[in-house]
């Protein structure tokens, strides 16, 4: 199977600031200096920041994306915008899938906010085909080890393995 291109074919919503759309803002972004980690890993981390902020404020992630894009340093890249917009567009379905795969004594609201956002990103990547399920899970687990609680990496690994099984079962 040929490798997927680095960008996705997910159509972008037109999000506007007072005078420019997110797409226009992103296109004006200068090349950033190389930093540690892959481009996709950095995009996931930045998307996590934006989704986490929106979840914390109980606001629309598109508003946070617009603010981060207009005032960003370092700039928001198209891949980050794709992740945020993709998760936002499918969030209700993603959250239902997470809830179905959680143990009976857990709820979506009980999950640490970082874990919830990481799970949403990984599931969107699995559903959209922008990353293989293995890569999406591995990246979510790696970010959980770095940014969340002690047990989060194991928790997310188990949850996302269950989600992966469900998604593969739906394809057959």
Task: Describe each region flagged by the PLM.
Residues 1-172:
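N-terminal interaction/assembly modules
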């Amino acid at each position: 199977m040929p490798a997927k291109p680095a960008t996705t074919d997910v159509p972008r919503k037109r999000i506007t600031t007072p005078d420019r759309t997110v797409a226009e803002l992103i296109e004006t972004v200068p090349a950033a200096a190389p930093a540690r980690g892959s481009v996709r890993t950095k995009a996931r981390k930045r998307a996590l920041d934006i989704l986490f902020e929106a979840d914390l404020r109980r606001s629309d992630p598109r508003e946070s994306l617009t603010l981060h894009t207009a005032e960003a340093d370092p700039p928001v890249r198209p891949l980050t915008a794709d992740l945020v917009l993709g998760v936002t567009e499918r969030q209700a379905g993603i959250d239902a899938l997470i809830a179905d795969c959680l143990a009976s004594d857990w709820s979506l609201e009980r999950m640490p906010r970082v874990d919830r956002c990481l799970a949403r990103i990984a599931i969107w990547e699995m559903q959209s085909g922008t990353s293989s399920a293995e890569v999406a899970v591995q990246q979510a687990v790696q970010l959980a080890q770095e940014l969340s609680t002690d047990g989060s990496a194991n928790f997310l690994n188990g949850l996302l393995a269950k989600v992966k099984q469900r998604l593969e079962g739906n394809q057959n």
